[in-house]
Amino acid sequence: MKHLRRSHTIGRREFIKTGALAGLGVGLATLTGSASASVPPTPRVRRYAPLGRTGMKISDISFGADQLTPSQEDLVHHAFDLGINYFDTAETYAGGESETALGNALRGKRDKVFLTSKTLAWPDTKKGEIMQALEGSLRRLQTDHVDVYFNHAVNDVARLKNPEWYEFAETAKKQGKIRFTGVSGHAGHLIECLDYAIDTGKFDVILCAFNFGQDPHFYQHLLGGFDWVARQPGLPRVLEKARSHGVGVVTMKTLMGARLNDMRPYERGGATFAQAAFRCVLSHQNVDALIISMTSRESIDEYLGASGSQRVQAEDLPLLEKYARLNGTSYCRNACNACEDACPAGVAIADVMRTRMYAVDYGAMRMARDEYAMVARNAEACLSCSAKPCAGACPHGLKIDALTAPTHRLLTSA
């Protein structure tokens, strides 16, 4: 109890709250006092974390460039000036403009930063096609190598069994075009894919969805229910497995939908929901760092307010609980996939809801439409469906049948 530097006694309800984070390794011993007790320090990176066995030490809160365009290069400069040294992009982000913007903004700084990019390598993708994708990324990034090259958004182990990927990786490493390889994912077969990737011994980094709502202890104690990780108890195990194998762990989707405006009325004493969510993720002993979409100077400053925090603060818990209560039944836990078999037409419901999140919650319409265009079984069938077989399929109360058809219209309209 001495670690909880509070001016008043902890009541039973708050004691339960602190215990709720035990599953993340952030119980009473790691709770700190109020952030409002002193003037907040100037935002900047305050911790550089070893990324698994790679030897890289990266900013604990790093730059997600999924929405970056050439008109926003100043954001990259601002982030760099505040100490961010890890920049994550992909060939598909902003139609390639994200890589172009990073290449322009980081010209002359390449030896001071780590760059990652990604490509979608399918079960039948050839080595030469992957190499061609990499070389396109290198041109746009204006560099001769990337530090980590990811097989992007993997949700099918068959994509990890393609020998062409491993032949490509070996050649690209020998040529000095990539230093390390990774796998990223955030969908229903995440655990299976990460397990396989780690077991191969050929992936150096994993990038996966992880947020405070994915800890069963949080929901069990605070809300009397479970989030999807309780349906997939392998996630904490896989993160621990990655750590034991020297595989670096970077997390994304750390804001559980990122509905930040919902929380502004409840933020007090300088602490914000985003900072609380980041502290929760970074306090997990098997997480090295997180990436987050950085779309304004103000958001970068806000996010970096949580850098260096490997402990959850006392005022974080009410914010996390409030967010979960406000959004628990309207947020799609993409990797839950409990609804997978509900649609006789095979609509990829979780992917449809994920792209809706990009559009409605993130305000990233371009990214949402680009991602939706890649969903093999989108919600077009929902336009003519009257039976609504998906109604009630979400164990968390998401009204799937009322959202899929409008999402299709939203993301395909001219």
Q: Where in this protein do the model-derived segments appear?
A:
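Active-site groove signature of glycoside hydrolases
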Residues: 141-157
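Short Fe-S-cluster ligation motifs
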Residues: 361-389, 413
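Distinct, well-ordered alpha-helical segments
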Residues: 76, 99-107, 127-138, 158-167, ...
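Beta/alpha (TIM)-barrel catalytic core signal, keyed to glycine-rich beta->alpha loops juxtaposed to Asp/Glu
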Residues: 154-347, 351-354, 361-374, 402
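C-terminal segment of N-terminal export signals and the immediately downstream linker at the start
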Residues: 30-61
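N-terminal secretory signal peptides
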Residues: 1-10
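Conserved, mostly hydrophobic/aromatic
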Residues: 51, 63, 87, 102, ...
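N-terminal export leaders
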Residues: 10-31
